[in-house]
Structures are given as structure tokens and as C-alpha cells.
Amino acid sequence: MRKQVEIFTDGSCLGNPGPGGYGAILRYKQHERTFSAGYRLTTNNRMELMAAIVSLEALREHCIVTLSTDSQYVRQGITQWIHNWKKRGWKTAEKKPVKNVDLWQRLDAALSQHEIKWEWVKGHAGHPENERCDELARAAAMAPTLEDTGYQPEATAS
């Protein structure tokens, strides 16, 4: 019988782009583990993705996972966009490279190991675990120690 786990995630960015962080809670029965890290220059979407990735990659066996996020970007990316991106070789409908492809590919690989139920929660609406993840993410963003090597700044028109 597969273990049933709950994951709660949030990402934060002080400026977008700017210093950012993620926070996640992984819960199995009475056991809880938290994850957080801060990056010097990143985006809120990258931090939302990292929160889900890191917590899923921490699982050592196939699990039934309920993953809660307040990110529409993550939710829509997984439930609506990713299948077509993969079919098109990680290109958008406009034939442009998918933003944050490095993280979408990591998330896709992490998801393939588990049975996932996605839950969207409204951010900053009093959901206790989401609020804790937000606190972890903001604290990490305020004391960043890591480089987000996959972050690619937008090209600006000159």
C-alpha cells in the first residue's frame, strides 16, 4: 500500500525578478518536514516551482500525494499546458521556448514517480499551511544564499 502524503508549497520574490525563496511542508501521518531556501536573483514563478520540486524529490518511494499550491502558474502549467509543451519539444503554441523549462522538466520527472492530486488554495486567505509556507519562503528570500543558475533574464528591446 502506498503512503499518503500531503505537500504544501509557496514561493516568494522581493521584486520580480529579485531575491526569492520557497517554502514547503511535507506531511506523512504525524511527521512533518519543512524545506526552504533563498536565491539572490530569481522570479516568483521559479520559486513556486522549486517548492513543489524539492518536496517531491525528497520522497524516497512511490506515494499518493495531495499537493496544495496557491500558484495558478504551477496549477495551469501542470494541468493544462505541460502536455502540449512536451509534444512540441518544450515550445509554446507560439513556437517560443517554454519559460523555466529546466524546472518544468524537473517537476515533470518528479511527478512521474507518484500519484498526484493537485489542490489550489487562495493565497493569504488564512490557510494555515499556506501561511507557514509563505513565512518560510519570505524568510528565505530575505536571506538568500544560493544562485539560481537556471534563471534567464528577459531580453530587453533596445
UniProtKB/Swiss-Prot annotation:
Q: Which residues bind Mg(2+) 1?
A: 10, 48, 70
Q: How is the cofactor bound?
A: Binds 1 Mg(2+) ion per subunit. May bind a second metal ion at a regulatory site, or after substrate binding.
Q: Which SUPFAM superfamilies match?
A: Ribonuclease H-like
The Swiss-Prot or TrEMBL record lists the needed cofactor(s) as: Mg(2+)
Swiss-Prot/TrEMBL keywords = Cytoplasm, Endonuclease, Hydrolase, Magnesium, Metal-binding, Nuclease
The answer to whether keyword ATP-binding applies is no
The record's note on quaternary structure and interaction partners says: Monomer.
Protein name, as recorded: Ribonuclease H
Taxonomic source organism: Cronobacter sakazakii (strain ATCC BAA-894)
Which lineage do the record's taxonomy fields give for this organism?
Bacteria, Pseudomonadati, Pseudomonadota, Gammaproteobacteria, Enterobacterales
